[in-house]
């Protein structure tokens, strides 16, 4: 930076400017050499580990860099101030972090970049791994027996890519990149266009011409040898691959999911793997004990990644460089930034890149295809696809599709030009965030004096789900009845009926509760309506509050929303599905599993934070409480 201004000239309206601006990185960048060199003379940069959050450096910082606000411990969350600029680098769920920032009264800015190519590369690698069994054969690299010897059983089931049919669910940028890559491997491509967002935001899919659109999801499943999910998690896509839908899957097909775990019914997928209907499965992240049991670890046709499908060193460097540019503008020019990349901007950026790098011949082909679709061109059946496969493969190998590594320097320029068009749209959101700063400032000051060693949301999920372990873990771990001991009358209230006040104030993390129906006809329980099926919330009269099916653990997401974990469902959280059914389908704490509490414990109203029409009227009885010593004990 050619000119360094004094920190006294930097406008900070919330509090007086310090002598030298200070930037703190929390739980994201340990090696700050790049930031320190780029901001030399402008601001100091320091990494603060979570073990040193009580040193006071977070409160004195002008800007804070972090990966996700939701995964930050509450002790660190309470030390953040409304006047600070909070940069969220590459958040996995922007909506959750933005909601939490609004609750805490923080000024949060998301910094991200497109990761479509990384996702497409990972999916292609997973497909090749399942087809060629490379992850299994690599363990036997030193064997001298050859494929005619002991390795022959391991090679059974290996498939060639040429001639296989790839079915893509969704129309995201990563889906289109995957289509181009799979066509290069001489695979046929089908796709099912899942509408996402408002209708006016939906653009025509820009898949390669050789790809064919299917009218229904069931048709795609029946015709595909490999299925890959590339759709966002919405009300319409929750468990888009449920047990009923998976009945149409082609026997011997492979399933790949690098999106949300809630896109598919994990119990149904597990059963199909056991039955052999699905030949293999690859997931980017898995939830719950059903994916961590011994049988999964021993199955060679199951691949599980630690949520790393969208990562690359290039992506992380782009995000850090964007954050540095934002800090320069903030410190030197006093510019309050907005979110640098949104989902819509990523879509525009990748679409324009394809247009710039594709020849005019393909533009004409796209127009012809669009016209033929408007005239009512019918989609292909699986038989027609096989007949016309040879001609489709020739069209797929045209030079216009080889655009992955070209014109990489044009991409940032296009993003900067488009980001200016979004300024007015973000202006109203920025005003809301600034108003929230003033209203929530006093609450943040008071809460920051409380316990600084509170667990983060992720730690709460782990601690609560540890009480609901898998069957393998239960052999070496005591049951809740063995762990929870009787306490003295001075430590716990003798009966939950004595609680008077708002339910949100009386219920704490780790409490065990029972939910009675409003008409007192029975208890709400979690149960499987069919063998090996999903978990539902039902009302039964022939159960007691001591039955594990009727017991739920309270897990707070923030001060206003809670989650209900089921003992019987292995710690899964209560949520609402697209059929307006109360189900237990996920272990992760998202907005789908968040509920607001209204009224008292005797007349409590649970309202889903995602769908306000999903309401559960119950009477809550506290069965067990967490004492000051951290031990959960039953109430007599």
From Swiss-Prot:
Cofactor binding induces a conformational change. Residues 342-357 have a biased composition (Acidic residues). Residues 1-21, 341-489 are annotated as: Disordered. One of its GO terms (biological process) is cotyledon morphogenesis. It holds the Pfam family 2-Hacid_dh_C. Changing residue 118 to K: In am-EM2; decreased trichome branching and modified microtubule density along the basal-apical axis of the trichome. NAD(+) binds at residues 91, 147-148, 169-174, 193, 231-237, 258-260, 284, 307-311. Residues 369-384, 398-409, 430-445 have a biased composition (Polar residues). Its cofactor is NAD(+). The keyword Transport does not apply. Residues 417-429 have a biased composition (Basic residues). Belongs to the D-isomer specific 2-hydroxyacid dehydrogenase family. Plant AN subfamily. This is C-terminal binding protein AN. The gene is AN.
């Amino acid at each position: 930076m050619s000119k360094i201004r004094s920190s006294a000239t930097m406008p900070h309206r919330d509090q007086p400017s310090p002598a030298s601006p200070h930037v703190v990185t929390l739980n994201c960048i340990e090696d700050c050499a790049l930031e320190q060199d780029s901001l030399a003379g402008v601001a100091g940069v320091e990494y603060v580990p979570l073990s040193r959050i009580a040193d006071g450096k977070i409160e004195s910082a002008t800007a804070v860099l972090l990966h996700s606000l939701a995964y930050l411990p509450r002790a660190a969350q309470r030390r953040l101030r409304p006047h600070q600029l909070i940069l969220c680098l590459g958040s996995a769920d922007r909506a959750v972090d933005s909601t939490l920032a609004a609750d805490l009264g923080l000024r949060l800015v998301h910094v991200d970049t497109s990761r479509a190519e990384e996702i497409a590369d990972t999916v292609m690698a997973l497909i090749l791994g399942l087809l060629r069994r490379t992850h299994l054969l690599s363990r036997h690299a030193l064997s001298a027996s050859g494929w005619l010897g002991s390795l022959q059983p391991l090679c059974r089931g290996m498939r060639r890519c040429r001639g296989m049919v790839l079915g893509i669910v969704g129309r995201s940028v990563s889906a289109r990149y995957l289509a181009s890559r799979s066509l290069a491997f001489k695979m046929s491509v089908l796709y099912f266009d899942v509408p996402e967002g408002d209708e006016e935001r939906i653009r025509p899919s820009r898949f390669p011409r050789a790809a064919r659109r299917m009218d229904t999801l069931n048709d795609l499943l029946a015709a595909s040898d490999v299925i890959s999910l590339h759709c966002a998690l919405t009300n319409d896509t929750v468990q888009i691959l449920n047990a009923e839908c998976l009945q149409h899957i082609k026997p011997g097909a492979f399933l790949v999911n690098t999106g949300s775990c809630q896109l598919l019914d994990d119990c149904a997928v597990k059963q199909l793997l056991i039955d052999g209907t699905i030949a293999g499965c690859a997931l980017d992240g898995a939830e719950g004990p059903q994916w961590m049991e011994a049988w999964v670890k021993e199955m060679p046709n199951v691949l599980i990644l630690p949520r790393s499908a969208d990562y690359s060193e290039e992506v992380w460097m782009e995000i850090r460089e964007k954050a540095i540019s934002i800090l320069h503008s903030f410190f030197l020019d006093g510019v309050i930034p907005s979110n640098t990349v949104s989902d819509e901007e990523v879509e525009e950026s990748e679409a324009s890149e394809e247009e710039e790098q594709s020849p005019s011949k393909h533009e004409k082909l796209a127009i012809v295809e669009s016209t033929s679709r408007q005239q009512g061109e019918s989609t292909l059946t699986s038989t027609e696809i096989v007949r016309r496969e040879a001609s489709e493969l020739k069209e797929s190998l045209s030079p216009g599709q080889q655009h992955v590594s070209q014109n990489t320097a044009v991409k940032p320029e296009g993003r900067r030009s488009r980001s200016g068009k979004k300024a007015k749209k973000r202006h109203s959101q920025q005003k809301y965030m600034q108003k929230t700063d003033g209203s929530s400032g006093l609450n943040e000051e008071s809460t920051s004096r409380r316990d600084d060693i509170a667990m983060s949301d992720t730690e709460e999920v782990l601690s609560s789900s540890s009480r609901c372990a898998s069957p393998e873990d239960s052999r070496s771990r005591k049951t809740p009845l063995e762990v929870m001991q009787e306490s003295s009358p001075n430590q716990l209230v003798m009966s939950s009926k004595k609680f008077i006040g708002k339910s949100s104030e009386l219920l704490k993390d780790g409490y065990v509760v029972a939910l009675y129906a409003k008409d007192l006809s029975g208890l709400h329980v979690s149960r499987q309506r069919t063998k090996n099926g999903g978990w539902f919330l039902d009302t039964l009269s022939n159960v007691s509050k001591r039955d594990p099916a009727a017991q739920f653990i309270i897990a707070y997401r923030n001060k206003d929303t809670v989650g209900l974990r089921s003992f019987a469902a292995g710690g899964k959280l209560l949520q609402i599905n697209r059929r307006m059914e109360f189900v237990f389908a996920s272990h992760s704490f998202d907005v789908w599993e968040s509920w607001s509490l209204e009224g008292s414990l005797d007349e409590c109203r649970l309202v889903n934070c995602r769908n306000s029409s999903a309401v559960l009227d119950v009477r809550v009885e506290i069965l067990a409480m967490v004492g000051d010593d951290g031990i959960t004990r039953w109430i007599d």
